[in-house]
């Protein structure tokens, strides 16, 4: 499979952007975008983990930026939140968020952004079906680490009921939205 450009690469080539400055700008703006989307939260009374716009932003940044920039953006986002900035869901921040029940989901963001970026670099963000598959795989990376970590807090008998099933409807909406946005963006850029 041939490597293709990501949306971020498309603009870098068009603007002849200085590599390090362009990357730094993308990483910082991407981490702020994720922080803003994380504040879109729907707390669930029966779960320790809210439904947020965070995962949508993580997967979108990964696909738009590519594997390396996407993962670097997530690392920056996690570092900003770990330092105490209110960047995580519902304005939380600090190491307690990374070490608490949601910590595994947060750590899974790195793999999710890298994976969706890697797939986008191979053209998986060009049509609705392949974008949907890429987003499902990215979500799987988040859930694998998130559920494994959450099981330390709630026990393996409750982990799916508290950390997976309630979030499937929200994940479907976010995946559908991304599957519409990315191919449309590419059609617009090809003009």
What kind of feature is each model-predicted range?
Residues 1-31, 162-191:
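Alpha-helical transmembrane segments and their cytosolic interface
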Residues 2-71:
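Hydrophobic transmembrane alpha-helices
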Residues 2-16, 22, 36, 95-142:
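Short helix-perturbing small/polar motifs within transmembrane alpha-helices
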Residues 26-37, 58, 62, 73-81, ...:
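Alpha-helical transmembrane segments in multi-pass membrane proteins
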Residues 36, 40, 64, 90-91, ...:
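Helix-loop junctions at the membrane-solvent interface of multi-pass transporters
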Residues 40-114:
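Alpha-helical membrane segments and adjacent membrane-interface helices in multi-pass membrane proteins
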Residues 64-68, 115-123, 185-189:
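Structural signal for the C-terminal ends of transmembrane alpha-helices
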Residues 123-191:
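Membrane-embedded alpha-helical hairpins and interfacial helices in multi-pass inner-membrane proteins
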């Amino acid at each position: 499979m041939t490597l293709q450009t990501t949306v971020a690469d498309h603009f870098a080539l068009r603007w002849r952007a200085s590599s390090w400055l362009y990357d730094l700008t993308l990483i910082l703006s991407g981490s702020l975008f994720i922080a803003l989307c994380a504040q879109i939260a729907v707390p669930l009374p029966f779960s320790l983990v809210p439904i947020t716009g965070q995962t949508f932003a993580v997967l979108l940044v990964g696909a738009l930026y590519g594997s390396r920039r996407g993962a670097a953006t997530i690392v920056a986002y996690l570092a900003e939140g770990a330092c105490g900035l209110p960047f995580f869901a519902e304005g939380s921040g600090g190491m307690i968020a990374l070490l608490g029940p949601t910590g595994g989901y947060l750590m899974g963001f790195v793999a999710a952004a890298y994976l969706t970026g890697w797939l986008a670099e191979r053209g998986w963000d060009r049509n609705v079906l392949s974008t949907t598959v890429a987003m499902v795989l990215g979500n799987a990376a988040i859930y694998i680490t998130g559920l494994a970590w959450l099981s330390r807090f709630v026990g393996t008998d409750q982990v799916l009921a508290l950390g997976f099933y309630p979030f499937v409807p929200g994940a479907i909406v976010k995946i559908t939205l991304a599957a519409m946005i990315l191919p449309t963006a590419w059609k617009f850029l090809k003009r």
